[in-house]
Amino acid sequence: AKILDTLKKHNVKATFFVVGNFIETSPDLVKRMVKEGHLVGNHTFTHPDMSEIATEEAFHQELSKLEDLYEKTTGKKMKKYYRPPQGKYSESNLKMAKEMGYHTIFWSLAYVDWYESDQPTREEALEKMVPRIHPGAIVLLHSTSATNAQVLDELLTRWEEKGYSFKRVDQLT
């Protein structure tokens, strides 16, 4: 909720790639994301290594099961944006995603923020993220990171001071 509060404060619309467990355990946050104009994309139902998923049936199930849960939760169809877990994929995955109508999205700026029990400090996060911003950056920040919730306001402020503005991925493609 703190991340959504910060985005609202800065009038920023973001893109969130969610998994099945997140929708199941935080349906109110997902509904709030939608209500506040954020884009919610597909990060698969179970967060597997997608480069290991070889069959169309298994691939389709990972994405469509999440689509169904999202629609059941929000009453809306999920937009066709997909981020492979851990950035792992195969060429056939990219083809299958495209055949399902998906835009596959990667990132250009990230840091190790995904270990919930081993979070970087505020200083480490700012040192890694502030100077590395660049035009057209797609920034990967995990919403489950306590550090990100703590530093997002300062990150956005510093980047805004450098002249940056922020868009959802569907506004870039």
Predicted feature residues:
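Active-site beta->alpha N-cap acidic-glycine motif
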Residues: 1-80, 154, 165, 173
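Structured helix-beta-strand junction loops
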Residues: 10, 36-37, 100, 135-136, ...
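A cross-domain feature marking catalytic cores of carbohydrate-active enzymes
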Residues: 18-21, 42-44, 84-86, 108, ...
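Alpha-helical scaffold elements lining the catalytic groove of polysaccharide deacetylases
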Residues: 48-74, 88-135, 148-150
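Catalytic grooves of carbohydrate-active enzymes
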Residues: 134-170
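Divalent metal-coordination and catalytic microenvironments
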Residues: 7, 16, 40, 82-85, ...
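N-terminal start-of-chain detector that recognizes signal peptides
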Residues: 12-13, 110-113, 139
